[in-house]
Amino acid sequence: LREGGFSAGFTWDDFIQDLVSTEGTLTAVAEKLCAARKWEEDVGSVERALRRLRSRGQMAGGKWGSRTLAVFGLPGGVRARLRWMGAYHSRFTDLPVSVCQDLVRLWDHPPTTERREDRVWLALARTTIALRQNDFAAARTELERAEPDLTVAPEEARIEAALAHAFMASRTAPADVAALLERVPPLLLHVTGGEDRACLLARYIDQRAYALGTIDGGTQDGAAREKLYRQIPTKGAPPFALCRRANGLAYALWKQGRRQEAAAHAREAARHAGDGGHVRMRAMALAMLARIEQGPEAEDARVRATSIGQRLEDE
């Protein structure tokens, strides 16, 4: 819990200390802040304000907390941790639900919650936790509360929200899924991070494919799903995306009666999940293999998938 040199109990003192380490001295931090504010205040006054700010612990930072964050932002390691918790395709979701809840609580305070573009990731993390508990009402509440923050959030966060809305609709209002997923492609155009983009694309395609089985009585299943899953790129793709592709193909081929090919893809999905350390994805792949295969291998896969789910506290 000390990635980037910060404990989970990140405080204003930690924030100021990071700025001092970067700029050299507290005076240098104050000078940079003064310059950004067009010298509305003198350096001495700002330096004293920063000394008061670093004693605020995890309380609201007031005007100087807001001003300092506006100029410098949170440290890169802290921002990365918040994004990690908010991304469904990260290994945050491979932790037991109770551990995920503890981690979110440990970061859910100032200074990490002072800016909208930072705290939105905590809302997304809480949404994922609620979905893992099959608590759609709580997930919707989190997303509704996050709407104002999403307007200034990066594209990745807005895609996360759109995919969460579409996932819930696929279980409760299938006719709404297509419109919800239409929000994703324009946002994906602006996602430049290779691994994040690959995972988000794989999740988008996966949800489009799932929707095919919920409309017209499922008549658009099988071959149409296979065509979609084959659109997920494989060259240089991270294990998460490769697992989603293989598991999706396993189901699509199984629906077409191609059981041996389907089982091979399910085994491939389990292998990719293991390579990436994605425990939940491995459970899904094993569950798929249990549906496709017969006999001892199917029973073994079913038992292993169930055991993983219990250990992760998934509903």
State where each predicted segment sits.
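Helix-turn-helix repeat elements of alpha-solenoid scaffolds
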Residues: 23, 90-108, 128-147, 170-188, ...
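DNA major-groove recognition helix of helix-turn-helix/homeodomain DNA-binding modules
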Residues: 58-78
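Short coil/turn linkers that connect adjacent helices within long alpha-helical scaffolds
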Residues: 111-115, 150-154, 190-195, 232-239, ...
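A structural signal for repeat-array scaffolds
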Residues: 76-85, 89, 106-114
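Long, ordered, amphipathic alpha-helical scaffolds
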Residues: 29, 239-240, 250-252, 257-315
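A short, Lys/Arg-rich alpha-helix, primarily the initiator
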Residues: 1-38
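Tandem amphipathic alpha-helical repeat scaffolds
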Residues: 85-95, 120-135, 157-174, 198-217, ...
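Recognition helix of helix-turn-helix/homeodomain-like DNA-binding domains
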Residues: 34-60
